[in-house]
C-alpha cells in the first residue's frame, strides 16, 4: 500500500490534471496561444502519472472485490480461482506502486541531452589501449542501434589500432539518460595479442560521460581562455596539414585543457573543443558546488587502478559482470557489439530503487 504522503501527492496531481483539462476547453485559453501551449506542456508532464494512478485505483477495487469473494464464496473451485486472481493483482499492485513512486522522483535535467564520452587507456599498456578501442566500438554499436549519431572530437591512436585516449560526441534523444551509467573504470581479462606465453592479463580503461552543454548553460568569459593553434594530421591522423588547424584551449581559472585536431579546418576544431570545454566546466562546477556528495557520476574518470572498477569483461569465460548491480551476462561478443540494454535497464531500475529508498528515508526522518 502506498504511503499517505505519496497518495496525497498523487491526488494533488490528479486534481491539477482535471483543472488543466477543463481550462483547455475555455475560449479565452484557446485564443491565448502562449498560455494554451504552456498548459499542454504541463498536462503532458503529468499525464502518465495520472493514467498510472487511475490504473492503481482500479486494481485496488478489483483486489477488494476478490478479497470478499475469497471469504464468502461457497464454491471451492470459484474460491480457488479468486485466490489465484488475487495473487496476480497483488503482483500488479506491487509493480505499479514502484512505477508511481519512480514517476514522482525529480527528473535529471540532463537526461535528454547529447553527451561527450571520453575513453582513456588505464593500467595495462598497449593492451589497455586496445581495450579502449573495443569500448569505443561497443558504444558506436550501441549508438547505431538507437539511431544516434557519433562524431569523434579527438583521438590519440596507437600503432596496433588501440587508443591512448578518444573523445567523441553522441547525439540522440535520451543519450545521457542511457549512457551516464557507463562512467567509471572498465576492466578486461584476456590473453593480449602481444602475449606469447598465453597468460591472461588484466587491463583497464576509464570512461567519462558528460552531458553536452549549450552556451546558455555554462558561461565562459573569453578573457579566461588561452587559445593556441598547431599543425596537425587530418581526419584520422592522415595527411599532414601545412596550416595550423589544430586548436588547444586552456581555461585559465580551472586549468582545464582541451585540444582538437581531427577536423581539417581550424574553425571546426575550435567549435568541437569548445563543446568539450563546456561539458568539462559544467562537471567541474557541479563537483565544486556539491563537493560533499561522493556520487558515482561525479567521480567518473577514476585513476585506472585495477581495484577500482564498475564492470569486468572476462574473455575466457565469455562473461561480462557489472559489479554495481552484481549482474553477469555470458554474451560477451553481443555486449561488445553494442547490446548494452540488459545492463542499462537494470542500472536504471537500481538507481530508481535507491532514489525511492533515500526519498522515503528522508521523509521518515522529517515526519
From Swiss-Prot:
One of its GO terms (molecular function) is translation release factor activity, codon specific. The modification N5-methylglutamine is found at residue 238. InterPro entries: PCRF, Pep_chain_release_fac_I, Pep_chain_release_fac_I_sf, Prokaryotic/Mito_RF, RF-1. SUPFAM superfamilies: Release factor (SSF75620). Methylated by PrmC. Methylation increases the termination efficiency of RF1. Coiled coil: none annotated. HAMAP family: Rel_fac_1. Peptide chain release factor 1 directs the termination of translation in response to the peptide chain termination codons UAG and UAA. This is Peptide chain release factor 1. It comes from Dictyoglomus thermophilum (strain ATCC 35947 / DSM 3960 / H-6-12). The lineage of its organism: Bacteria, Pseudomonadati, Dictyoglomota, Dictyoglomia, Dictyoglomales.
Amino acid at each position: 500500500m502506498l504511503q499517505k504522503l505519496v497518495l496525497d501527492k498523487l491526488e494533488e496531481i490528479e486534481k491539477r490534471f482535471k483543472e488543466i483539462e477543463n481550462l483547455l476547453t475555455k475560449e479565452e485559453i484557446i485564443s491565448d496561444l502562449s498560455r494554451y501551449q504552456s498548459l499542454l506542456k504541463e498536462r503532458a508532464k503529468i499525464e502518465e502519472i495520472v493514467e498510472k494512478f487511475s490504473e492503481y485505483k482500479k486494481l485496488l477495487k478489483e483486489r477488494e472485490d476478490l478479497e470478499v469473494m475469497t471469504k464468502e464464496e461457497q464454491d471451492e473451485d470459484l474460491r480457488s480461482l479468486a485466490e489465484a486472481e488475487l495473487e496476480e493483482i497483488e503482483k500488479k499492485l506491487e509493480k505499479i506502486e514502484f512505477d508511481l513512486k519512480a514517476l514522482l522522483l525529480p527528473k535529471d535535467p540532463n537526461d535528454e541531452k547529447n553527451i561527450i564520452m571520453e575513453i582513456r587507456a588505464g593500467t595495462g599498456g598497449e593492451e589497455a589501449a586496445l581495450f579502449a578501442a573495443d569500448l569505443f566500438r561497443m558504444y558506436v554499436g550501441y549508438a547505431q542501434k538507437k539511431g544516434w549519431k557519433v562524431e569523434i572530437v579527438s583521438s590519440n591512436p596507437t600503432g596496433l589500432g588501440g587508443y591512448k585516449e578518444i573523445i567523441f560526441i553522441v547525439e540522440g534523444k535520451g543519450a545521457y539518460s542511457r549512457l551516464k551509467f557507463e562512467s567509471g573504470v572498465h576492466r578486461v581479462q584476456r590473453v593480449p595479442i602481444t602475449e606469447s606465453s598465453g597468460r591472461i592479463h588484466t587491463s583497464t580503461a576509464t570512461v567519462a560521460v558528460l552531458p553536452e552543454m549549450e552556451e546558455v548553460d555554462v558561461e565562459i568569459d573569453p578573457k579566461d581562455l588561452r587559445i593556441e593553434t598547431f599543425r596537425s594530421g587530418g581526419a584520422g591522423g592522415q595527411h599532414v596539414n601545412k596550416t595550423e588547424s589544430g586548436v588547444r584551449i586552456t581555461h585559465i581559472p580551472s586549468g582545464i585543457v582541451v585540444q582538437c585536431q581531427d577536423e581539417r579546418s581550424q574553425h571546426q576544431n575550435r567549435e568541437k573543443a569548445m563543446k568539450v570545454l563546456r561539458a568539462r566546466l559544467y562537471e567541474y562546477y557541479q563537483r565544486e558546488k556539491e563537493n560533499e556528495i561522493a556520487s558515482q557520476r561525479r567521480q567518473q574518470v577514476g585513476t585506472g587502478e585495477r581495484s577500482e572498477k564498475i564492470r569486468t569483461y572476462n574473455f575466457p569465460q565469455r562473461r561480462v559482470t557489472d559489479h554495481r548491480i552484481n549482474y553477469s551476462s555470458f554474451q560477451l561478443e553481443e555486449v561488445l557489439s553494442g547490446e548494452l540494454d540488459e545492463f542499462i535497464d537494470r542500472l536504471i531500475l537500481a538507481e530508481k530503487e535507491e532514489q525511492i529508498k533515500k526519498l522515503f528515508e528522508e521523509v521518515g526522518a522529517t515526519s
